Amino acid sequence: MPTLNEIQDYLARSGDDAFRWEYPIHEFEGGWFTWYDDAKVDALIVLQAYGNNRALLKQAKMMARQLHRPRIRFATQHKGAAMARLFGGRVVAEIIDIEV
């Protein structure tokens, strides 16, 4: 499992010149979460979340409500998939959207 610093470094290097990841990344049990806002998506982004465990989903829903995000977007890593990658505001990985 990558460290938080490795993820932040990856996000800093992964976008094009017009894209800068300026939102904080927070660690929690089971992974990390962050968010972004644009015309298409206003979601809590959960990175490195493992499985569909109920406790994780409950915690993510609670955080999404606190952050006033209408959706949770899971970018998951499992079954040997590469680390979830964010490019230009798009999540490139297995994505699961859940309405809060």
Name each model-derived stretch:
Residues M1-E27:
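Amide-forming acyltransferase catalytic core, primarily the GNAT-like/NAT-type
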Residues E6-R13, F33-D37, R54-Q59:
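A broad, low-specificity signal for short, low-complexity segments enriched in glycine/proline
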Residues F19-A55:
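Conserved donor-binding loop and adjoining core beta-sheet/short helix segment
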Residues Y23, E27-G30, L67-P70, G88-V92:
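Short glycine/proline-enriched coil/turn segments at helix->beta-strand junctions
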Residues P2-Y10, Y36-K40, A75-V100:
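Terminal substrate-recognition subdomain of acyl/acetyltransferases
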